[in-house]
Amino acid sequence: MAPPSRRECPSPSWRFPGLLLAALVLLRSSCSDACGPPPTFEAMELTSRPKPYYKVGERVEYDCKKGYHHFAPFLTHSICDRNHTWLPISDEPCVRKVCHYIPNPLHGEAILANGSYSFGNQLHFICNDGYYLIGKEILYCELKGSDAVWSGRPPICQKILCKPPPKINNGKHTFSDVDVFEYLDAVTYSCDPAPGPDPFSLIGESTIYCRDNSVWSGDAPECKVVKCRFPVIENGKQIAGFGKKFYYKATVIFECDEGFHIIGSDTIVCNSNSTWDPPVPKCVK
């Protein structure tokens, strides 16, 4: 609340004594019994237009501003007293209107932005792990007519579920008999025995899990035969990764004979398309 004001009268100039004397008499007679503008409040406003000054005994009435309502039988008026000040209103009888209480959603939480349900505030919603929000994440306490109401319906927290992961050729995954998977449920893929002399290799991630957006964490892997040709290097030799056959992710390391230096990488890996990556290096002088 702004402090009550007292009407201050201007000091006259004496350049025209006759006229100013008469004006001074009139001015003093009105100002000496006058109060300045009435006090202002955060939650109340005048019911009539304010005047520049008020006579002793004049009374002004206040009412709650839009969005506020009376909560106690305190005074809602002030009077210009004989001391040319406004009788103070000790306590404002108006408080902000509030929206109705909204409980925590099942499997979630409702969080007030500043601990109050009064209009202008926000209510934030979050869900527990394993659940996702259906509806608006934030509701606003707004004025609708003379009431404080929420900007929408409270959201709900729905359990995160994934459909069964894809089946793959030449392989399988665990829990293949389950129809619905919950948040963070995981399945692991493996390859079947190959019908020929070379085994199937699992290409991709062997384990995937149900994520928070109800999709799997990655694509299903692939089971296929991956076999790279025997790596041959002239003027050099293989020093690691020996074998008769080279399947997926087989790693070979080379070095050049004395007097030669290597062009390319000394380490190569058999990748998923049955080629060496990077290519087999060369040894040159």
Swiss-Prot record:
Residues spanning the signal sequence: 1-32
Paired cysteines (S-S): 35-80, 64-94, 99-141, 127-157, 162-210, 191-223, 228-270, 256-283
Q: Which residues are glycosylated?
A: 40, 47, 114
Share an example GO biological-process annotation for this protein. Answer: innate immune response
A GO cellular component annotation here is: inner acrosomal membrane
Q: Which PANTHER family match?
A: COMPLEMENT COMPONENT-RELATED SUSHI DOMAIN-CONTAINING (PTHR19325), MEMBRANE COFACTOR PROTEIN (PTHR19325:SF521)
What is the purpose of this protein? Acts as a cofactor for complement factor I, a serine protease which protects autologous cells against complement-mediated injury by cleaving C3b and C4b deposited on host tissue. May be involved in the fusion of the spermatozoa with the oocyte during fertilization. Also acts as a costimulatory factor for T-cells which induces the differentiation of CD4+ into T-regulatory 1 cells. T-regulatory 1 cells suppress immune responses by secreting interleukin-10, and therefore are thought to prevent autoimmunity.
Q: According to Swiss-Prot or TrEMBL, what is its membrane topology?
A: Single-pass type I membrane protein
* UniProtKB keywords: Complement pathway, Cytoplasmic vesicle, Disulfide bond, Fertilization, Glycoprotein, Immunity, Innate immunity, Membrane, Repeat, Signal, Sushi
Species of origin reads Saguinus mystax (Moustached tamarin)
Comment, domains: Sushi domains 3 and 4 are the most important for interaction with C3b and C4b.
The record's annotation in SUPFAM superfamilies points to: Complement control module/SCR domain
Gene behind the chain: CD46
Query: Quaternary form?
Result: Interacts with C3b. Interacts with C4b. Interacts with moesin/MSN.
- InterPro entries linked: CD46, Compl-Cell_Adhes-Reg, Sushi/SCR/CCP_sf, Sushi_SCR_CCP_dom
Q: Which residues form the Sushi domain?
A: 33-96, 97-159, 160-225, 226-285
Q: Give yes or no: UniProt keyword Transcription.
A: no
Q: Which Pfam families does the record match to this protein? A: Sushi
Record's keyword annotation contains DNA damage: no
Q: Where in the cell is it found?
A: Cytoplasmic vesicle, Secretory vesicle, Acrosome inner membrane
Write the protein's name.
Membrane cofactor protein
